[in-house]
């Protein structure tokens, strides 16, 4: 019985991890106040079509790989910006945005409003669908 419960939990985790969901409401993000960085340099610049806001921690084993993956997307696609916020010692940010795992990625529209949220390593086809809705190709 315990083995069955563990199997169901593992399958559920694999299916849901990296999937995103639309965000209801119009919550705007101020990158400057969050302490967002781009290549280690503070920034408050949004992408012309979309911004990928990655929340990471020092201890996140998957965050560097996701950072590289999203930076490559930014390089390939026009109008897209990728920025990062380290929440290792900033529990107030994790609480404000209900972040329980890293990486967590928010897709922001050109006004800085959260339109999509992904917990874990993003599934690229799903992320691309959301970016295309914002005109990123």
Show where each model-derived region lies.
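N-terminal targeting signals for export/organelle localization
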Residues: 1-34
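Anionic-ligand binding region
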Residues: 34-42, 48
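Short active-site neighborhood of thiol/selenol oxidoreductases, capturing the structured segment around
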Residues: 46-58
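The canonical Cys-X-X-Cys-His
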Residues: 60-63, 105
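Typically the conserved alpha-helix immediately C-terminal to a functionally engaged Cys/Sec
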Residues: 64-77
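Thiol-based oxidoreductase modules, predominantly thioredoxin-like and allied folds used
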Residues: 78-92
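Structural micro-motif
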Residues: 98-106
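Non-catalytic, surface beta->alpha helical segment in thiol-disulfide oxidoreductase systems
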Residues: 107-137
């Amino acid at each position: 019985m315990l083995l069955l419960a563990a199997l169901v939990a593992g399958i559920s985790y694999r299916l849901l991890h990296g999937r995103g969901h639309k965000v209801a409401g119009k919550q705007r993000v101020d990158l400057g106040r969050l302490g967002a960085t781009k290549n280690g340099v503070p920034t408050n610049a949004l992408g012309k079509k979309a911004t990928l806001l990655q929340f990471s921690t020092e201890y996140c084993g998957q965050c560097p790989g996701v950072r590289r993956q999203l930076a490559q997307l930014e390089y390939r696609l026009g109008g897209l910006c990728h920025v990062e916020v380290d929440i290792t010692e900033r529990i107030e940010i994790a609480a404000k945005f209900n972040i329980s795992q890293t990486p967590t990625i928010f897709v922001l529209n050109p006004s800085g409003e959260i339109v999509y949220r992904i917990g874990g390593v993003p599934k690229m086809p799903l992320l691309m669908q959301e970016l295309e809705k914002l005109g990123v190709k």
